[in-house]
Amino acid sequence: MEQAIKQLRNQQKQLDQQIEQQKQTLNSLISRREEVTKGIQTLELLSGTTLVPDQQIHEALQPAVSESTKGNQEIKTWKQIFDEEHELTREEKIDATVGQKKKAYVIFDGPWKGIYQDWHIVKSKVNAQPYRYKGYNSLEEAKLAHKQAYAEVTKADEVKVEKTMKSFAKNNVAEKIHGLHKSGPKELTEAEFYRNWKMITEWTEESANLGFYPDCSKQVKAVFFIGADPHLLSSFYQSGLISYIYLQEDEGQKGAISKATSQLPKELRRTCQQYQLSFAKTREFYLAIQSTYPVFDEEKMLVPAKHLVKLGISASSYPENKIVKTNFNFSLFINSVDKLYNYIRQYGTTIKGFKVLMKTQLCLAVCLIRDQAEESSKIMVMEFELDISTLTGIFSNLPKELKKATCEKMHRYKSHLCESCEINFPELSETMNVSNDEKRSTKSVSSDEINLSAENDGYQHS
């Protein structure tokens, strides 16, 4: 009997502990609900709108309410309502502050400071940004106000901020990129590649606040500058869609490379850092990039982009903004492989003075020097170009038909020889007799030796 009583008391003690835990949980929920209620009241005052009444929220929490009384109407959370109303209120506030009846507008801060006559453009640039702006009744008033403000913060001979790419270093463009990953770089997807392609081919002036503009004079590419978002820059780099990147020492941080490079491959990022410390210092420098486009199959990346990167000091002369509206096709991929190989093979032939700063399977970084290239640099160039000339390495994953089409394009180079090549040996003459001794003395040549000799034919790195 005593044993049974002891067991029941233990059960009672356990139940008491569970009840106490539930009380603590309930008190925590009540406390959180009170905080939410205060948040609702605060937001109602800020937005000037009527949100879901507190009594309705309380009733919705009661288990006695049946599902049939709710109907099919969707009940939005206070956060959803606030987000919608706040966005609307923000635009209405801008319209009310400046208005659309003015004839000219001035933006005093940020990369887009200047005079505008289209209110919609002004609103797109100042919305959700801490920029000062004002509307004027005449263009003359706007010009006078802009001139006075400009004289206060700049020297007379300084170039206007909106006319130089350095302006983007002063603006946190990352806030304008929504939906991009905040973690480290990850493998590019096919959907992301086509999104980037569309961002170039359908670029508008309003898109410039993302930190790039199109450079489609030779291929579909983009030029990125100092304040570009690191994740967007990394995505375009993996897409093989960059022709130039302009970088400079971070403002206020001596020796620190631009944050735009933070999501690039670590080897390339380290090379940029070393180049800045050794050569560029506080000057603006560039990365001139020649790349192949990646190849996908059912969302999976078969062949990543391969890059040749040349680093140099900027002369403040930038590529022309040129848009070409075209869709991606595999002939563009084939041309990108051909162009990359044509650029690489110049190092050691027509370009004598260069130095290889970094080499990986996907990237070769070089800079031009006065002296002739060292033998080690020439060897690295030959190693890097080998999988292009033979369509091996990363290009071994190309679909059969695409590899064959790429092979046909590469036939113009004597150094090209791949498994898709058709080798036509000369027919033996009927009168040609080879003795057994001569046959035995003939050395067999392996396929590797054929590839090597074909690669070196007509392309000597002197």
UniProtKB/Swiss-Prot annotation:
Family under the similarity heading: Belongs to the caulimoviridae viroplasmin family.
Additional observations: The inclusion bodies are the site of viral DNA synthesis, virion assembly and accumulation in the infected cell.
Residue stretches of biased makeup (Polar residues): 443-462
Residues covered by region (Disordered): 433-462
Presence of keyword Transmembrane: no
Name of protein: Transactivator/viroplasmin protein
Primary subcellular site in the record, as a coarse category: host cell
Keywords from the named record: Host cytoplasm, Translation regulation
Domain of life: Viruses
InterPro entries: Ribosomal_bL9/RNase_H1_N, RNase_H1_N
Role noted for this protein: Enhances the translation of downstream ORFs on polycistronic mRNAs derived from soybean chlorotic mottle virus.
Lineage per the UniProt record: Viruses, Riboviria, Pararnavirae, Artverviricota, Revtraviricetes
